[in-house]
């Protein structure tokens, strides 16, 4: 995991002219990937994913990779930062920013236009604002102290630390397991003890578009998509991951589909309990995504919101008009 301090990361983020980054963000099930692919196909662009779970190989149905959507008229639109690490590992913000810059520089060096697309607000904001990152070591003593605490107690501790740090790094409602909560507390504690010097940020030059979907339509699409993913073999996918040696605790750590379906597979939940709890969790997740994006606006990011109900042609024309 990484800590954020808004200052230039290194020399290649400082004073170097950069191609303006097109960014498309929005909550889950709003159609942002389809829009990014259609726009990329029209502009000859390449897509950089901003999804914290699509980086994992073999985690396909549960993360909604839908790689067939990147093919338009038989031609694949190039994409980056999907399927780059093994399941069971812990990918983090520090690695994402490093990998993003490598992909961005590669795309620009070939004269192409990069499009950043995803729903992981923390990743997007760190890239757009050019946050400097440093790794946070594990704190065995603190972990031992927190071991055995309930998720409710851990969440309250995290809230108190966030207030002390004036931190927006961790959305407490995203911390849906004790393992995640302990790591978040570890990071916030480190931040409190190692206050970083604040300097002006060196942002990536970007124009940001958001897809605004009607709340009830979003809920309908989320529920429909969950049924489709289960029908398409999401349970079998998670069984395969477990059979390949990925620990249940690692899959639970990834949250949402991987948390609840794993708990079903190992017998902790019935199918009906899994389905009901997972559906609620995804709806809550989409709400938290919108909360983060609104927070980005309050922190100075200008987001041009597009009605998700518009036809694809109108959305693309509106984006092109503003480029």
Predicted regions and their residues:
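Phosphate/pyrophosphate-binding catalytic cores of soluble transferases and nucleic-acid-acting enzymes
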Residues: 1-323
């Amino acid at each position: 995991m990484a800590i954020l301090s808004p200052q230039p990361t290194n020399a290649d983020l400082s004073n170097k002219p950069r191609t303006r980054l097109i960014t498309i963000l929005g909550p889950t099930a709003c159609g942002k990937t389809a829009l990014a692919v259609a726009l990329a196909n029209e502009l000859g662009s390449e897509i950089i994913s901003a999804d914290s779970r699509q980086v994992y190989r073999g985690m396909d149905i549960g993360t909604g990779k839908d790689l067939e959507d990147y093919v338009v008229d038989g031609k694949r639109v190039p994409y980056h930062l999907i399927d780059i690490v093994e399941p069971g590992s812990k990918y983090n913000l520090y690695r994402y920013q490093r990998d993003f810059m490598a992909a961005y520089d590669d795309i620009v060096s070939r004269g192409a236009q990069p499009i950043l697309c995803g729903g992981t607000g923390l990743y997007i904001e760190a890239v757009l604002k050019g946050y400097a990152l440093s790794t946070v070591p594990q704190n065995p003593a603190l972990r031992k102290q927190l071991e055995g605490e309930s998720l409710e107690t851990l969440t309250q501790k995290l809230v108190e630390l966030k207030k002390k740090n004036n931190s927006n790094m961790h959305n407490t409602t995203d911390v849906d397991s004790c393992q995640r909560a302990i790591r978040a507390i570890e990071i916030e504690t480190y931040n409190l003890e190692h206050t970083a010097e604040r300097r002006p940020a060196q942002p990536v030059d970007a124009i940001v578009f958001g897809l605004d979907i009607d709340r009830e339509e979003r809920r309908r699409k989320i529920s429909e998509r969950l049924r489709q993913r289960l029908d398409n073999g999401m349970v079998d996918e998670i069984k395969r991951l477990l059979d390949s040696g990925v620990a249940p605790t690692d899959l639970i750590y990834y949250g949402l589909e991987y948390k609840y379906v794993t708990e079903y597979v190992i017998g902790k939940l019935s199918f009906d309990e899994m389905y009901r709890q997972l559906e609620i969790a995804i709806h809550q997740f989409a709400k938290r995504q919108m909360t983060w994006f609104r927070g980005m606006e309050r922190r100075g990011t200008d987001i041009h919101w597009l009605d998700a109900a518009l036809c694809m042609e109108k959305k693309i024309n509106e984006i092109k008009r503003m480029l």
